[in-house]
Structure formats: C-alpha cells, structure tokens
C-alpha cells in the first residue's frame, strides 16, 4: 500500500487518503459547526459554499507519474525545470490516493492503493455554479470525472502554493498548517496481509 508524505514550512505529515484545498477543504472543515447533522452536513455546507463561492489563486506544480526517483527540495526551495507549473484561480484541488474519501464519495474511480501516484482533481474558477452543482451531484457515482471542467493530473509529487489568503489545507480530513504544501507518494510503504 502506498503512503504519501506532505511537507509545510513547519511540519511533515504522513497520509494515505487525500489532500484537499479549495471548496472540498472549506466544506469538510467549516461544516464541523453542524456536525450534529451527520453526513448530511457536507451536503448542506456544499450548497452554502456554492452559493457563496470562493475562488483561490495558486501555483500548482507537479512531477508527472513517470518520475519514479524523486528528491524533493525543501518546501522553501525552488523546483527544478522538470516540474510542470499551472498558475490560475481555482475552485477545487483534490489529491487522491484512494477511490473513496467517504462512503458516499467516489472521488477518484481510477485510484488503487498501490499505483504509486496521486490523481489530482482540479476545477478552475471558470466553472460556473450550475456546472459545479452538476459535477457534485455525480461524485457519489464517480461520474464527475467526465465533466469538462474537471481536470485530472496523474503525478508522483506536487507542490501547491496559495497566492491568495483564506484557504485551508486538509489532509485526511484534518486541518493542517495553511500556505505552501508539497506532497510525494511513497510507493509500497506498507505491506498488508489478507
């Protein structure tokens, strides 16, 4: 089973599920105030966040999945020229290593526990609220990945540098230090016996 290691300016984290930023992190973390609603809290807060939609400017840099030997620079250091870079306004950024982030969320249908890659789902700010609703309604079945506004990048490592304020970093459902974060897959880090 693969794990992933994340690094912020102050801390390192291990993970095996997802990293989210943008609307997914906003919904997950801000909906804690209505935890009494159970799983419905995510749906309620997603509607609220779509009505009051936020976009965040960021620089997303990634190494394609073919890069197996990764030497990650410190989060403060420059990246080498083999990293691909996208700078834009985003609604959603979701790096996945598993098919389901929750029982009712088929967020990354093509992920497997040992494929050695992140599947990073990105939605840019050009996506309308109506299109975002259509996409979210298909997350339970995995149909959202067929939507035109849904971009998926397969990579072995990434760095996300928020260029606007107010966003959250969310690893496996928990808030971590905001700001620049980078992650890399640690292939076959755990062996499981059935």
Where are these regions (language model features)?
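A general structural motif
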Residues: 99-103
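Catalytic core of DAGKc-family lipid kinases
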Residues: 1-98
């Amino acid at each position: 089973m693969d794990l992933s290691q994340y690094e912020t300016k102050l801390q390192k984290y291990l993970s095996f599920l997802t990293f989210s930023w943008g609307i997914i992190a906003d919904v997950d973390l801000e909906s804690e105030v209505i935890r009494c609603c159970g799983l419905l809290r995510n749906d309620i807060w997603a509607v609220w966040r779509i009505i009051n939609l936020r976009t965040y400017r960021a620089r997303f840099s990634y190494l394609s999945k073919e890069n197996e030997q990764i030497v990650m620079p410190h989060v403060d250091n420059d990246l080498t020229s083999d990293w691909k870079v996208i700078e834009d306004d985003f609604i959603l950024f979701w790096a996945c290593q598993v098919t389901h982030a929750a029982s009712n969320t088929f967020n990354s249908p093509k992920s497997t526990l040992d494929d050695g890659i992140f599947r990073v789902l990105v939605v840019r700010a050009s996506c309308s609220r109506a299109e975002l609703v259509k996409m979210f309604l298909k997350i339970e079945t995995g149909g959202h990945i067929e939507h035109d506004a849904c971009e998926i990048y397969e990579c072995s490592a990434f760095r996300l540098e928020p260029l606007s304020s107010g966003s959250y970093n969310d690893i496996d459902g928990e808030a971590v230090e905001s700001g620049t974060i980078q992650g890399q897959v640690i292939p076959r880090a755990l062996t499981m016996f059935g």
